[in-house]
Amino acid sequence: MKLMQIGVIGAGECDEETYRIAYRVGELIAEKGHVLINGGLGGVMEASAKGAKSKGGLVVAILPRKKDLCNDFADIRIATDMGHARNVIIVHSSDALISVGGGYGTISEIAIALKEGKRVASLKPPVVIEGMRVFETPEEAVNYCISSSVK
């Protein structure tokens, strides 16, 4: 099995249900031995990173500003000082992406990923865009991403 870098994208603030879903996505990515990449802030990013760490996973945070803004669950912190432009780095660093909820930033990441031909699985999508796949469970979303070929 080839190691994958799976991006988990979503809003920096979220409700409890979205947090639980993102946490489970992080757990599953780690359990399957893959690397989780995200934006390093709160909400979906924190939840997915925390879930991955609970299962011994590796988390890479691509931060919009400085390293000290990162949540406590990233192993590798990449400070870009690029604001939302860092979304492009998250997408290009990921072999496949899973969106959990989200807003405009998440929509931009989904669009860039689809433009680049990457698989995008979505749970509670902010919008549905042609080419992305919507799933009901974290297990389905993670399995879909893992079944993709590494680019």
From Swiss-Prot:
It comes from the Archaea. InterPro entries: CHP00725, LDcluster4, LOG_family_nucleotidases. SUPFAM superfamilies: MCP/YpsA-like. GO terms for cellular component: cytosol. Transmembrane segments: none annotated. NCBIfam families: TIGR00725 family protein (TIGR00725). This is Uncharacterized protein AF_1126. It comes from Archaeoglobus fulgidus (strain ATCC 49558 / DSM 4304 / JCM 9628 / NBRC 100126 / VC-16).
